[in-house]
A protein has these predicted regions:
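Active-site-adjacent beta->alpha loops and helix N-cap segments on the catalytic face
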Residues: 35-43, 93-99, 136-149, 253-255
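Glycine-rich, proline-tolerant flexible connector loops at the mouths of alpha/beta enzymes
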Residues: 22-40, 61-67, 250-256
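Conserved small/polar residues in nucleotide/adenosyl-binding loops
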Residues: 274-278
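Hydrophobic faces of well-ordered beta-strands that scaffold small-molecule active sites
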Residues: 1-2, 21-23, 57-61, 88-90, ...
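Conserved, mostly hydrophobic/aromatic
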Residues: 13, 92, 123, 165, ...
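Catalytic alpha/beta core domains of metabolic enzymes, predominantly
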Residues: 107, 111-239, 256
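N-terminal basic/disordered segments at the start of proteins
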Residues: 1-20
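Active-site beta->alpha loop and helix N-cap motifs at the rims of alpha/beta catalytic domains
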Residues: 39-100, 105-113
Length: 278
């Protein structure tokens, strides 16, 4: 699943061999104020381009939603349903519930921080796909997958819940993106789609009492290393991951195409290797 923030990136994702893309429109998505976004008027064209090339389209509606946002939330999901978007990616029960009520398919966003099978059982009534918390290790992911199979945890379609995980890109320093740095520094809430990436800046560290600057090995002390799983995708598949998501809706089309191509090739190689082992 490739990230798309412009028509150029959409075409790059298609050329790179994406099986699906995810994107946002004006509001209520986690990049609504920190990167380029489409508008409601773009939905039909995006869906048409995706269908023409045999890929699925997923619309993010995954910010914190306040009472005053409910009319906009319904308007966005109505537009998604009318344009026949494949699914919305949601993190608020209000959005999930409304989407279900009008027959719009839902995927569970990583913003929900689903990190165990019991939480997944609760949310399974709303969605057929879950983007698990990024903080999980492969052993924990496999345990959730085992519970899905053993307990027959199914979504609205009556099929077993499918696991989706981020496979490549920037990682938030906060748990599942619930960060307040942008709000503290610039009065811009990351939880409302306005992450200013404060954590990815270089910092010096001083002792407040002595005013002595500490000697640190890496100035990027609040920025985790970017995620890269291309060298163990076979292990992710064995753990039950079925959808590999690339971070980067704010990235340019060159990045989108290159990373999508690399991961598509890696998926094919892993599948071929699995078949050979069998």
């Amino acid at each position: 699943m490739a990230p798309v923030g412009s028509y150029e990136s959409l075409m790059a994702a298609i050329q790179g061999g994406a099986d699906s893309i995810y994107f946002g429109i004006e509001g209520l998505n986690m990049r609504s104020r920190s990167s380029n976004n489409f508008t409601t008027d773009d939905l039909r064209k995006i869906v048409a381009l995706c269908r023409e090339h045999g890929i699925k389209s997923y619309l993010t509606v995954n910010t914190v939603i306040y009472g005053e946002d409910l009319p906009l939330m319904r308007e966005i999901i109505d537009a998604a349903k009318e344009a026949e978007v494949s699914a919305i990616i949601a993190a608020d029960v209000a959005a999930m519930n409304y989407a279900n009520s009008i027959g719009q398919e839902v995927h569970l966003s990583t913003q929900l921080n689903i990190s165990n099978a019991e939480a997944l059982k609760f949310y399974a009534r709303f969605a057929d796909v879950v983007v698990l918390a990024r903080e999980l290790n492969l052993k924990q992911v496999h345990e959730i997958y085992r519970q899905i199979v053993d307990q027959q945890i199914t979504g609205p379609k009556g099929e077993l819940i499918r696991i989706e995980m981020f496979a490549h890109g920037a990682l938030c320093m906060a748990v599942s993106g619930k960060c307040y740095l942008s709000l503290h520094e610039m009065n811009a809430s990351a939880n409302r789609g306005a992450c200013m990436q404060i954590c990815r800046r270089a910092y010096s560290v001083k002792d407040k009492d002595s005013n002595i600057e500490l000697d640190i090995e890496n100035q990027y002390i609040m920025s985790p290393k970017d995620l890269k799983t291309i060298h163990f995708m076979n292990k992710m598949m064995d753990a039950g991951v079925r959808v590999f998501k690339i971070e980067g809706r704010a990235r340019g089309p060159e990045y989108v195409r290159l990373v999508t191509e690399c991961y598509k090739e890696a998926v094919r190689a892993s599948v071929s290797y699995t078949h050979l082992r069998a």
